[in-house]
């Protein structure tokens, strides 16, 4: 592990000439304001070492990466019963596709596309007012990262609320098929706030370390999920974590991961480390263009791909 900082530094040097590539998510007004010429990366190893480079301490909107934490909460509440509400298969469609949801009777393909994440949020809301569910998620993420400074960006949440028409349509479809138990506006209120979680690369890598360490956080001693559940969440991230770019990410990077349209990607090298990278410019399927390039470089230079070096 001693040369990990040198590896990160070399990746940063190779990425620097390309910083600014990709297009920021302009359909969310607050994200459209983000300067694309930023790049950060952090690695937290299972033995507690932290390596960082670039803008790794700048908080950004984690967006769909939050779905990993919400899924963990939902599985903790209802266990395998969750899979009656949402599938475990790659979608092959855009993350906000309506056609597939209608064709499959209101059961989303997986928990990482928007419809699936909205159904997962509905599960977490059981017994909670919307504000309480938002608070539960924020407390959980702070607990995972051991960092009380993590917040939700209310401006981003409001921005999404004002423009999230497709998500409103998805939620109404599921409500019509009786796959949402709570009022649509309540569920979406929580969903938009969870997507507005603001975290730095280092905070994100710390929060997700339990998935690299068989369900426990070795830095805090907290047991989060069973080894079996950690393995299964990682499997879902590998197959479904990058929308209709999931196969391409597995091919080039070979690590379980989850992307967000804020430009972040969270990835796991099981038994070794958790990784977070951020570069706001997105590729055509909504994943960080340079984030994916940096992770491909990391996997190639470390041999961390789950498929071998």
Swiss-Prot record:
It comes from the Bacteria. The keyword Hydrolase applies. Transmembrane segments: none annotated. Pfam families: Glutaminase. Its EC number is 3.5.1.2. Signal peptide: none annotated. InterPro entries: Beta-lactam/transpept-like, Glutaminase. GO terms for molecular function: glutaminase activity. The keyword Transferase does not apply. Keywords: Hydrolase. GO terms for biological process: glutamate biosynthetic process; glutamine catabolic process. Substrate binds at residues 64, 114, 160, 167, 191, 243, 261. It catalyses: L-glutamine + H2O = L-glutamate + NH4(+). Homotetramer. Belongs to the glutaminase family. This is Thermolabile glutaminase.
């Amino acid at each position: 592990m001693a040369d990990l900082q040198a590896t990160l530094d070399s990746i940063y040097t190779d990425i620097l000439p390309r910083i600014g590539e990709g297009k920021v998510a302009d359909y969310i007004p607050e994200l459209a304001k983000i300067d694309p010429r930023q790049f950060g990366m952090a690695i937290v190893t299972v033995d507690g070492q932290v390596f960082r480079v670039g803008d790794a301490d700048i908080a950004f909107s984690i967006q769909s990466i939050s779905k990993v934490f919400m899924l963990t909460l939902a599985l903790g509440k209802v266990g395998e019963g969750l899979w009656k509400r949402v599938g475990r298969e790659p979608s092959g469609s855009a993350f906000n596709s309506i056609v597939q949801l209608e064709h499959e009777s209101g059961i989303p393909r997986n928990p990482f596309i928007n419809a699936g994440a909205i159904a997962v949020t509905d599960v977490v809301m059981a017994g909670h007012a919307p504000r309480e569910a938002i608070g539960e998620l924020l407390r959980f993420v702070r607990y995972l990262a051991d960092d009380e400074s993590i917040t939700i960006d209310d401006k981003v949440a409001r921005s999404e609320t004002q423009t999230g028409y497709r998500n409103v349509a998805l939620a109404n479809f599921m409500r019509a098929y009786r796959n949402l138990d709570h009022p649509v506006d309540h569920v979406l209120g929580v969903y938009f706030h969870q997507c507005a979680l603001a975290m730095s690369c280092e905070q994100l890598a710390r929060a997700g370390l339990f998935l690299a360490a068989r369900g426990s956080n070795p830095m805090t001693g907290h047991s989060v999920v069973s080894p079996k559940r950690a393995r299964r969440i990682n499997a879902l991230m590998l197959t479904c974590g990058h929308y209709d770019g999931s196969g391409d990410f597995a091919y080039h990077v070979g690590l379980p991961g989850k992307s967000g349209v804020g430009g972040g990607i969270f990835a796991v090298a099981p038994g070794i480390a958790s990784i977070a990278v951020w570069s706001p410019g997105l590729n055509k399927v909504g994943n960080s263009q340079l984030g994916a390039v940096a992770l491909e470089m990391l996997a190639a230079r470390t041999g961390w791909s789950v498929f071998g070096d």
